[in-house]
Amino acid sequence: MVSLIDTIEAAAEKQKQSQAVVTNTSASSSSCSSSFSSSPPSSSVGSPSPGAPKTNLTASGKPKEKRRNNEKRKEKSRDAARCRRSKETEIFMELSAALPLKTDDVNQLDKASVMRITIAFLKIREMLQFVPSLRDCNDDIKQDIETAEDQQEVKPKLEVGTEDWLNGAEARELLKQTMDGFLLVLSHEGDITYVSENVVEYLGITKIDTLGQQIWEYSHQCDHAEIKEALSLKRELAQKVKDEPQQNSGVSTHHRDLFVRLKCTLTSRGRSINIKSASYKVIHITGHLVVNAKGERLLMAIGRPIPHPSNIEIPLGTSTFLTKHSLDMRFTYVDDKMHDLLGYSPKDLLDTSLFSCQHGADSERLMATFKSVLSKGQGETSRYRFLGKYGGYCWILSQATIVYDKLKPQSVVCVNYVISNLENKHEIYSLAQQTAASEQKEQHHQAAETEKEPEKAADPEIIAQETKETVNTPIHTSELQAKPLQLESEKAEKTIEETKTIATIPPVTATSTADQIKQLPESNPYKQILQAELLIKRENHSPGPRTITAQLLSGSSSGLRPEEKRPKSVTASVLRPSPAPPLTPPPTAVLCKKTPLGVEPNLPPTTTATAAIISSSNQQLQIAQQTQLQNPQQPAQDMSKGFCSLFADDGRGLTMLKEEPDDLSHHLASTNCIQLDEMTPFSDMLVGLMGTCLLPEDINSLDSTTCSTTASGQHYQSPSSSSTSAPSNTSSSNNSYANSPLSPLTPNSTATASNPSHQQQQQHHNQQQQQQQQQQHHPQHHDNSNSSSNIDPLFNYREESNDTSCSQHLHSPSITSKSPEDSSLPSLCSPNSLTQEDDFSFEAFAMRAPYIPIDDDMPLLTETDLMWCPPEDLQTMVPKEIDAIQQQLQQLQQQHHQQYAGNTGYQQQQQQPQLQQQHFSNSLCSSPASTVSSLSPSPVQQHHQQQQAAVFTSDSSELAALLCGSGNGTLSILAGSGVTVAEECNERLQQHQQQQQQTSGNEFRTFQQLQQELQLQEEQQQRQQQQQQQQQQQQQQQLLSLNIECKKEKYDVQMGGSLCHPMEDAFENDYSKDSANLDCWDLIQMQVVDTEPVSPNAASPTPCKVSAIQLLQQQQQLQQQQQQQQNIILNAVPLITIQNNKELMQQQQQQQQQQQQEQLQQPAIKLLNGASIAPVNTKATIRLVESKPPTTTQSRMAKVNLVPQQQQHGNKRHLNSATGAGNPVESKRLKSGTLCLDVQSPQLLQQLIGKDPAQQQTQAAKRAGSERWQLSAESKQQKQQQQQSNSVLKNLLVSGRDDDDSEAMIIDEDNSLVQPIPLGKYGLPLHCHTSTSSVLRDYHNNPLISGTNFQLSPVFGGSDSSGGDGETGSVVSLDDSVPPGLTACDTDASSDSGIDENSLMDGASGSPRKRLSSTSNSTNQAESAPPALDVETPVTQKSVEEEFEGGGSGSNAPSRKTSISFLDSSNPLLHTPAMMDLVNDDYIMGEGGFEFSDNQLEQVLGWPEIA
């Protein structure tokens, strides 16, 4: 910079000096001129002035003159340039005006484009010299007309006497339509000399843009060589052209036929995009290379696009059929029309090569064509000969298209046009024809013999016997139905008559019947062929296009069902290759008098363009299925025992597509059975979300009322009830999603019914009649294997509504779909199918050319996704070890089910409020990760729910299921529907409590006895296994015992003022909000009722009877103090805060007191999820806000340990002991009763909230009069427990029991003197480890943390009295602790409090909802609840509740933000902002719940692909 400035200054000084010199010289020169004016000129010349050599200018100022001249020259040059430009502009304007273009198009052109088009115009005039003149053509036409007139034939309508008509607009339009493409003229250098205007319709590129351009700019680079070859001319040919004398005046032509990929800017929705982002479209260019005598050549061609088979809108004619091939051109789908045209049935061609069915002389051309198809994606064959089955051949032209799956070619679909009749019928061209012809002759003779037999009356006994044989040998009926179009061979009237004739003949054996059935379609093949020829001729001369079923509709329209008479959309047949038979027809329907059933399944399915193929109905399955049908019993039995078919054969429900190709050697339903656990990771919790956000239709469109097979199990009771059971379902409209029988083969296909009696009937039918169902359904579902449950995922790109919307009408047609239009998928561009589903699907999946297949969003809805599958499809995610334990527990439960038959009476009383609350769950089910396993329990669980109706009311509320996270017991939250969601929740909770306490003590007592017996049995089993596995499970026991016991510390121990802020560090790392966390929606239910501790040998029910009366008296005293109780349900992750209604609570508790006084029966702890209370997940503890009235008697010190975990098979998060059963888990939310819990850390609940001791002391006075907690044992345990329980979440992860001297804390002062009854391992105190950092930070060694896999909540190993070794680094290492497919997160201290949920996600998610929402919500809720009770409450409890109600608004939350970030990398959910919002924020239930936007939902669904 400095040097630059210096140079500028120096230049300025020089300029000044030069100016000064100039002025001096001018002055001196003027003086010299004046002084030397008298001197001679020689003197002036001889002695010039000093300045003269530099400027030989006079004093007249010539330097100024020079500058003026320069400026003038510049001005002149600028003027000249302007003039030239104006002249150029004028010339260009004149030139553009002379162009044969529209003025609007011309105005958009720049000069270069005008020159380009002008040159192209000149070349076009040159090109016309290559073509014979129109005048010559007219002369030829006139001569033809004159000769025709001379022959006195009919004069043609078209008069072509002058050129005027051909130059008119009408002729141009007719020419465009005749071309069926666009005209393209290329120079020998590849310049586009001419292109017709309609190129825009095919490629989206305008004529103006392409004229004069080079073809290389628009064609695919791999096709350039082929284009050059087509434009080139071999030397000998060129020389031959020059030598031929006639070429001097004429033209030589050479045919060209090539497939070129050209850029296409049109999208599937008709929009135009930029040329830079255009995709390629295969254009079939056919034309001639025109060469004149000078050697100049042009390629004059017509470009025709090859239609994609999914876009064919017009109905295919009877002489057009579809085939689908693998990449080696083996048939995988065969159109039924081939039987009429060529004599082939699908089984004749499946898995055979196309090249074995064509004439040998055409092999070379076919091979070249299909090589081009495989490389370019589309192609069209030349005319080739396709051999007939019995001899002869037809000429066929095929258009082939590759269908892609994720950019990988999957199959080849061919649209075949038959362009001739069957020629040379009696000539044999292959060995296959010879074999088929000989077989056909034999069958013809046998058919003639059978027709000669006299008709006999049908003997009922023979028919009955025949029925049995038909059931046992279902091959024959399936074979009849596997040939849906074989009866199309004769005319329909003859077909019906012959079918009646044959059906009424009573065959002696079933095999003879089968022979007759086989002979029927095969008989009279020559008549079939003649019929096909007649159809072709009739079609060629018909005024309009004939649909496929034209001949059937005209001949036998009376025999068709109403829906067959209605017009079908184009792709109907592919999605519906054959009308599915009724699910349970009478077995003798086909063979006996019901002839319509024999004819209807065989009616042609009105195929349109691509229907049968696009469904990818694997006809290869049919042959294998017929062999498997001989023994359908074995797989059916397997499926009835905890197995679920992932793909329902009837295509009903939300059956998703498989991404990988089918294993064609097995049947889908029998082999795709995966052993089920009794819960679904994600099933119905998104019903409400989908109903509001995503579904274009009402969610009730999935209802069983739209199907002939309803949700009721009564449908399967008798074969004749297939269509009559729908009106009898009272709850079918309520069970919109849960009860639709997505798979009739699945015995547990229905979720928790809203009507308990209906559910019980359904369960009985599902369990009692599985064998009859399997015998009846198995052959039928094999025939249904062509339905759309097997829809090719590739073809599905055009029908994305099949996946994105949950309407079952958009799937392939069920048996009783509303109408053919509803059942068949709409074509892309048909005018009557532009429905909401089409628009939605196009937005999601834009499909431009066949080279851009499905989006990456396609796998969202496949069966591996846990989000959108039906409940039956996803009960498969828990290891077999857990399932074995659960089966043992189920057997134990079934032993006691008979004792509780009387419980159903009260359940029926609760049906009406349950039915009123069906739609309640839609507002609460907004977490896509919560587990709703209670909606699809196993048969044992359903039966147990029905028997234990009083304890477990089977409510279909997803809220209960979400909160419980249970498999078999739903938390029934009953009441009238409130205005807000919070009120509904409150009412449901209150009625739940009321119902609990109203149920008879006998039921409670017997159930409690069952619990104790099961607990003791499980303890014995555990102890036996613990002796063997003690060494392996010590660490696991440490982890899990703390997991269990740390909850007890919340209630049992005095809240000391010794809480300190270093706890915040323990909370920082524990709660990585993961999919596994979202599974653990645990309902905390505090129970009023407690039972006395029972010794392990107390297996008999008598000890319970003794304590029942005492407990009842104590209960009555307590319930007078519980009228103002606040129940807060806090979910593990989305902290749903539900506020109780005070008045309803008072009324209910009064009713509870009255009933308990009347009945004098023992109330029991109601177990959520059956007896298995939702245990604590490692990633979530539940924060609890409750005022706990004190107990007054010693017998009230009930151990929550007594609650057995007998029914943990329905629970996702088992707190397992050695066998995973029987370990005590406290009921996590007990109804405002006092509990005596073996707990050791008094500050645990406070630590979860984290207030200072000073704050607790200041709040002590506020709560002094409400409750009293025992303070006697606190002082000796506070220091020890403050060290042990640094965080609840650490205790959950690193939970172990050390044998300890610490005593159990008793809540009552009176009970403090009483020693708790030793319960073995249940009575042992809890020992919490103190070193949090080593355990929490060492999350890499935790087997529960396994990357981004999608996992269920971890199942814990048991915590045993054998204690742990005290290692804080011990983690759960059971095999079943990490179920496959889920990701556990590294949780040190997973508290549910608002602290973690708000602060953890604050930095990671761009959540608009910050802490204030949850904090204010919970605070307001706490304020609304009356704080004071009649009972005294210690100071610490008040502080704890205020801490909870504060939602962590204190100093914890900001400080915990800092060390959370390292969790985010391992958490797959943190990558999706919508999911983070869902995980992060509390649901403000009073404000209408949480709602997704569409973008957020897509982001949630777009989380990383799960292995």
Curated annotation (Swiss-Prot):
Subcellular location: Cytoplasm; Nucleus
Every bHLH domain range: 72-125
PROSITE patterns: BHLH, PAS
GO cellular component terms attached to this protein's record: cytosol; nucleus; RNA polymerase II transcription regulator complex
Start-end of Low complexity biased regions: 26-49, 718-745, 754-777, 823-832, 907-918, 926-951
InterPro entries in the cross-refs: bHLH_dom (IPR011598), HLH_DNA-bd_sf (IPR036638), PAC (IPR001610), PAS (IPR000014), PAS-like_dom_sf (IPR035965), PAS_fold (IPR013767), PAS_fold_3 (IPR013655)
PANTHER family reported in the protein's UniProt record: HYPOXIA-INDUCIBLE FACTOR 1 ALPHA, PROTEIN SIMILAR
Protein name: Protein similar
